[in-house]
Amino acid sequence: MEQKQNESTELRPEGARVMDAPLVTMNVNDFIRQIKDESAWEKNDRNAMAIYKTEGMRIVLIALHEDAIMEKHTANGIISLQVLEGEINFNSADQSVSVKKGEMIALHKGLPHSVAAVKESVFLLTIADFRD
């Protein structure tokens, strides 16, 4: 398997990090500090960073300021969402749940949902699309 990494950008000059390899280690606390130190965090109600990407799966670290809303949308795979800091409200067509630090949820592919930050929050979003 070929190792893949992202390229550095103007917004993330130190960005060259491994995105896919037989084994990828990630320091999530360092990534949290990084996205909260970026100008995008200061200018917007959120910031995010893909920390792993391979065929069939992606992991994204997302930080939301208090009261930030991710409007209703769908995902092209099964998702899991694990709150690392703060608290969010996760709303699907069938129910609305509060998800706090240390808790997680899972949702099937293609179901409409939205996310609202009750307070400043950080979570890991995993999107998996497996074809058996």
Question: What annotation goes with each model-predicted range?
Answer:
Residues M1-G56:
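A short, N-terminal "cap"/entry segment at the start of jelly-roll beta-barrel domains
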Residues W41-D45, E55-T74:
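Conserved short histidine dyad/triad with adjacent acidic residue
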Residues E55, L84-E85, K100-K101, K119:
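A cytosolic small-molecule/anion-sensing beta-strand core signal
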Residues R58, E87-N89, S96, P112, ...:
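Structural motif
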Residues N76-N89, A93:
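Glycine- and acidic-residue-biased ligand/ion/polar-headgroup-sensing regions
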Residues D94-K109:
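Short acidic-glycine-tyrosine-enriched beta hairpin
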Residues K109-D132:
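Ligand-binding loop in jelly-roll beta-barrel domains
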